[in-house]
Structures are given as structure tokens and as C-alpha cells.
Regions:
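Ligand-binding "clamshell"
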Residues: 124-131, 149, 155-159, 269-281, ...
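Mature extracytoplasmic/periplasmic domains
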Residues: 296-357
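Conserved C-terminal helix/tail region of periplasmic/extracytoplasmic solute-binding proteins
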Residues: 354-383
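A ligand-binding cleft/hinge motif common to bilobed small-molecule-binding domains
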Residues: 119-122, 253, 259-276
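Early extracytoplasmic/lumenal segment of secretory-pathway proteins
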Residues: 54-123, 250
Length: 383
């Protein structure tokens, strides 16, 4: 059997690329902890794997969930099955781009999927999602209005998605290596930090940094603006130690770099491991990402899907997920249950709304613009 191999340390975060934003998720131990001791039903379909539930439910009720690797506390799955009698059939993916064609093909009728903001938009535009019956999701009341409003950037009428987890992209810096205030993307072009800057190895993330530093939208499709951003990234390239994925976490914890572009959930973990690290959302603004729960149009267990979504919106369950994953929850009541005050009041996990005023979610820009972005990125990397 081919499976996602987990890291040895359960605290090592996010080993899969979350495109375009490149967020990293742990490869799950879920398969080993939950299914290895039990009888395993493994269905191989177009290169993917669906894992059979081990709860022993004989009612036939089930919900088929397709989620990022280790993006849920596995105990929640057990609790949901025990409390509802609904078996959870669980499959994981590494990127939105792996997930999308599998949902689009309809070969497996997934009931719940967790795409990123821009991918929700794409799935809506391509008529792949069912409207959620919110009468079956009463716990939606615990999702803060601000996140429902933000989600309108990709789901304009809030018909198809429920915010699950969210975060920001910013700069993680070492206070002992950086001797000036960090409040702007411009510091990533300071020659003083040559060979001590880490950039995300992701086309949209890299362009977001450059576009925002120039005062443009990170969703720009203006060719002149994109060309200006390309030139800025080429100018920066001699200063960059590495274009990285999950290595930014390890390098910053190990004092191997002074500055790194990173995701807020990763930054929170890094700061716990190295108290010399600080995180900031630059004043020009950044990417605010939201991963959302949706129901594909061909789902065969829609009511069970809504029951599962409702369960994840329960405050105590949201709190369990935060403790396990350390990415921000949009659930205000769940946040109040976080015992660790430093985490509950963390400015990284829960920044003040004023810090988000110039932030944007990524939009799906269309296939033609994706080609343009990728071509410009190749030009940058080849210099």
C-alpha cells in the first residue's frame, strides 16, 4: 500500500504544499493510529485512497470527507462517529490542485471537502458545489460575522461554504539578528540581510509580496503591474538565501536566517520553539487565507455532510482543532475555550482587525492568468 508517511514528531507542521499560497500541513498519522489496528477497506480510485471507518457502525450511514493532510484532530472523527452513529470515510490530499480534478471527475462522490478560498470560487464558477442548508447547521451562529463577511470575496452570497480555519502571511524575524523595526515588506530588499532572507517557493506568494510592496492588489492581472513585480523579485534574488517550503520553519527556529515569509500558524509554532522570533503583518497588507467546508454537488450523503460541518462548528470541537493544528479558528466561542491565555490572546493567531485592513484573500484568476503568472515565475527562477 502507498500511504502518506508521517514525520516522527507530531509537532512538525504541515508537510504538504497548499497552492497557491503554499501553506504546509502535517502528513497524517490518522491512517496508522486509527485504521491499522482495524480491518482496512482501501479503495484505489485514480491514484487516490479512501480509508474505511473502523467504528463498526452497521447502520450504513456514512460521510465521505476529503481534507488536507492532518487538518483535523483525529479524536474528533472518533467522537463524531460515537455521537452520531455516522461512519467517517476519510481521504487526504496535499494541494488544492490535486483535490480539484478528483472532485470534478465525480469518480468518488465526496460529501465534504475543504478547499481554500480561491478554489471555492473556482468550484462555484464551475457549478461543482451544492448549496448548504443552514437549517441543518445551527452551530453556524458561532462563526464570527467578520469571517462570513470576508468569505463573500469568494462565495458572494455565503451559499456554498463555511469558514473552517484561517490565517495570514507575514514576516517572521529574529530580534537578535534584525536591529530595526519590521513593519514593511521593503525590509526583504535590504542588502544588509543578504543571504539571510527566506522566500516562499510559490508563485502567488512571491508575487503577493512584491505586488503588495508596490501598492498593488495581490490579485492583479495588469500586465504592467506584474512586470514591475517580476523585476522587483529579480532584484531581490541575490539577497535570498533560499526559496523554501516547510524549511522556513526549521531555518528560523535554528537561527539560520534573519527574515522569512511564513504563515501565521507556522509562526505561532516557531515562536514557541524560539522566543527570539517575532511575526508581523506588513503595513502594506498581505494574504488573509480561509479554508472552507463545502459539499460537492454529487454528494450522496448531504444531510450527513451538513451534520459533520455542524459538528466542526461546535465551540469545543473548534477549540480541539486549534489545540491540534495551531491555525486560527473563526469560531469566537471556541476561542474563549482555549485555556492557554498566551495562545487565546495571541496577536499572531488572532490579530486585531486593524492589522487586516489591507489584507486580501487570493482569487481564482482564470487559466489564462495562471499561465502568465507561471511564465513570469519561471523567468524569475531562471535568472
Amino acid at each position: 500500500f502507498l500511504v502518506n508517511m508521517p514525520p516522527d514528531d507530531p509537532k512538525v507542521k504541515k508537510a504538504a504544499v497548499h497552492a497557491p499560497a503554499g501553506k504546509f500541513r502535517k502528513f497524517s498519522r490518522f491512517f496508522f493510529h486509527r485504521f491499522a489496528p482495524a480491518a482496512i477497506m482501501l479503495v484505489i480510485v485514480i491514484g487516490g485512497f479512501v480509508y474505511g471507518s473502523s467504528s463498526g457502525n452497521m447502520s450504513g450511514e456514512k460521510v465521505i470527507v476529503y481534507n488536507w493532510g492532518d487538518y483535523i484532530d483525529p479524536e474528533i472523527i472518533t467522537m463524531f462517529e460515537d455521537e452520531t452513529g455516522i461512519d467517517v470515510v476519510y481521504e487526504e490530499y496535499e494541494t488544492n490542485e490535486i483535490m480539484y480534478p478528483k472532485v470534478q471527475s465525480g469518480a468518488i462522490a465526496y460529501d465534504v471537502v475543504c478547499p481554500s478560498d480561491y478554489m471555492v470560487q473556482r468550484m462555484i464558477e464551475n457549478d461543482l458545489l451544492a448549496e448548504i442548508n443552514y437549517e441543518n447547521v445551527p452551530n453556524l451562529k458561532y462563526i464570527d460575522d467578520i469571517y462570513m463577511e470576508m468569505s463573500k470575496q469568494y462565495d458572494p452570497e455565503n451559499k456554498y461554504s463555511v469558514p473552517y480555519l484561517w490565517g495570514t502571511v507575514g514576516i517572521l524575524y529574529n530580534k537578535k539578528m534584525v536591529d530595526e523595526p519590521v513593519d514593511s515588506w521593503n525590509i526583504l530588499w535590504d542588502e544588509k540581510y543578504t543571504d539571510s532572507i527566506l522566500m516562499q517557493d510559490s508563485v502567488r506568494d512571491a508575487f503577493a509580496v512584491a505586488l503588495k510592496s508596490l501598492g498593488y492588489s495581490l490579485n492583479s492581472t495588469d500586465l504592467d503591474e506584474l512586470e514591475a513585480a517580476k523585476k522587483l523579485l529579480i532584484k531581490q534574488k541575490p539577497l535570498v538565501q533560499a526559496y523554501v517550503i516547510d524549511q522556513v520553519r526549521d531555518k528560523m527556529i535554528g537561527n539560520e536566517a534573519a527574515l522569512g515569509v511564513i504563515y501565521s500558524g507556522e509562526a505561532l509554532y516557531c515562536q514557541k520553539e524560539n522566543p527570539d522570533l517575532e511575526y508581523v503583518i506588513p503595513k502594506e497588507g498581505s494574504n488573509l487565507w480561509i479554508d472552507a467546508l463545502v459539499i460537492p454537488k454529487n454528494a450522496q450523503n448531504k444531510k450527513n455532510a451538513e451534520a459533520f460541518i455542524n459538528y466542526l462548528c461546535r465551540p469545543d470541537i473548534a477549540k480541539m482543532n486549534f489545540d491540534y493544528i495551531t491555525y486560527s479558528i473563526p469560531n469566537s466561542a471556541g476561542r474563549e475555550l482555549i485555556e492557554d491565555e498566551s495562545m487565546r490572546e495571541s496577536n499572531i493567531a488572532f490579530p486585531d482587525i486593524s492589522q487586516l485592513k489591507n489584507c486580501e484573500t487570493f482569487n481564482f484568476l482564470g487559466d489564462e492568468n495562471e499561465i502568465i503568472y507561471n511564465q513570469l515565475w519561471r523567468e524569475i527562477k531562471s535568472k
